[in-house]
Amino acid sequence: MRVWAISNQKGGVGKTTTTVALGSLLAASGKRTLLIDMDPHASLSGYIGVEGGAHGSVYDLFGIGGNPLPPGTLVHATKWDHLSVLPASAAMITLDRQLGTRPGMGLILSQALAELAVDFDHVLLDCPP
């Protein structure tokens, strides 16, 4: 599985557009593609038409206020073949403060990606500014 992080320090430069375009091209070529919306603004989630909320989001990987949810249960199919999304949540804006100095917090996303590796050929991370 290849992991692509689409990032830039500035907002409004096309990170989400680039993520959707690359993901769509990969999916159209038959590659099992997962888009992960890491931005609390959740633009990618809205654009694809999959909102986090009650259905779970990236935020739920971190187990704030309870146990973390398995990443596979948070992945949503889209109306496009071979394209899935793990949506964002506005609650992610508080994640740094809530995690504090919790041991292993830097490994949570890495571990989630390892669990998803058998299901996807490519993962694209739409990062916040």
What is each PLM-predicted segment?
Residues M1-P129:
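P-loop NTP-binding core
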